[in-house]
């Protein structure tokens, strides 16, 4: 966002040098500003505080108007640190909301909440900007057709399919593979759908944001040689930023994604990590603005704020935004207002399991805990639905038998249960898959598996046709033909050893 008030561009009006406002009160990241009569800014307008601090360094702080207080005063929330600000400093109304660069030039770059690049790669090569505040698409613009968003990841497509233009909650602790799964989805949407991705880092660790950027460069998701060939734009408002920046960075990322959907007519993946931090920042701002807190100390406008973000994430007749949102659950309490409000908007949940991660099953998506509203016969078809249900039943029965196996051993099971356990172990291994973005670590080429191939593979395992193959043959392969080929190779190797 350009904050020189005499310059046009970046969605900020060309303004004459007019009588500015003055800072009259500073409470942490919240400022009260007095304007001359008749010159009051609108709600959500961007203000710029200009001046010099006590050692003569220039100050340029962007703020957003949140309340009109009367007596020609407004209350605004700062988007960067307010260190060095003093009462009486000049404040200029830009006449428009915060506006950020959009379009292909944003790919491969890292931005802050104001749309300023923070990756030391120079200015963004675009004059196209969009305001971060806008209405959700009108009902008549929406594409209400229910369609599956194929990811090429077997466990997701079969058991908890994503809806095109839907919202997915990604649940998982530290180190279970959220980042790798996110990068694989970014890679696959670019290859299979010709789509792009936008990653919004909302209130998470700066180190994690840096690690993600480095891993994306290493795996080719961000192309260092030709930045225009990159598949993702990154927008960061990390946990050291003021609450205003953390509250608005999700909208900045969403605005960039909306341009790809509405103007470029592409399918877009929008990642938000972490949606809880968006609510948390809103809660901090709400208290500073003097609003009465609601349940558990959250802001009274919690549902409205969440709705204004989530309702813009949808499919239109031009394209779609499919959003994957990491959800932190405070104290593992699912009834906490923040996660409870988030759940109301989700179409699917992808739960990552530390137990599967310990077994070496990657991706470590829990097939029994992950859910989707799309897994209905009228949407996915009878064949897909039946196969998914039989896979879940087999895995559920295996889970129930594990205590007996641990105490008494496999030999104490009935013949029928032994067969079921063998098939369940094959299914568990067949749900694993080599990822394109993990090639540099594993040395094995990544695999994109179409939905029809996935269904065929699991049907063959369930039917018993592959009972004679060793379970190791199903581990980290793509489709079922690769599993049978791997079984033959394993047999040849064992024969050679003999």
From Swiss-Prot:
- Keyword annotations of the record: ATP synthesis, ATP-binding, CF(1), Chloroplast, Hydrogen ion transport, Ion transport, Membrane, Nucleotide-binding, Plastid, Thylakoid, Translocase, Transport
Q: Where in the cell is it found?
A: Plastid, Chloroplast thylakoid membrane
What GO terms in the biological process aspect are recorded for it? proton motive force-driven mitochondrial ATP synthesis
Q: List the catalysed reactions.
A: ATP + H2O + 4 H(+)(in) = ADP + phosphate + 5 H(+)(out)
Q: EC no.?
A: 7.1.2.2
Amino-acid positions noted as binding ATP in the UniProt annotation, renumbered to this chain: 172-179
* Protein family: Belongs to the ATPase alpha/beta chains family.
User: What name appears for this protein in its UniProt entry?
Assistant: ATP synthase subunit beta, chloroplastic
The source organism is Nicotiana sp. (Tobacco)
The opening ranks of the lineage are:
Eukaryota, Viridiplantae, Streptophyta, Embryophyta, Tracheophyta
